[in-house]
Amino acid sequence: MGFFDKLFGGKAASETKFSGQKMTVMLPIDGKVIPLEQLPDETFASAIMGHGCGVETTGDTVYAPFDGTVTQVPESLHAVGMMSDDGIELLIHVGMDTVEMKGQGFTSLTKEGAKVKAGTPLLKVDLEAIRAAGHPTATALIVTNSDDLPEISVVANGDAAAGTPVFKFKK
């Protein structure tokens, strides 16, 4: 059962399907890939919500990192939850404590339940508005059901463009 199922009381998805190939998640926003523990938020940095990485964000658009379904777009628009067609749950959380901005600086380009292809724009981000509100602009990429999946490896490092492979899964 993944994080969103636990949070919203949904039922667990049937077994995650892997076709024997290494699964890959693409970087959803331009920036510098950093280890999860370097994020300026203890909840993300300690991997309580799942394994992943951080991104010192430089881009202003969040793209779908894989083919899948948008599972969550909070009213505050600061994050997007997704489920890949292969069963990978990913939380893309832009900025730290940006829920406090109540949507200012964010424009949603999608909605919950939307089926999207990798590279589909999901969210526009105003990094200056985040900074002006006194929040770090780092983005957390969290595989919220990482305990239910094969071993995850962060394969991107340093400056990277959206669309660069960032996570791979091994059997």
Regions found by a protein language model. Name each.
Residues 2-171:
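Contiguous, well-folded functional domains in the mature portion of proteins
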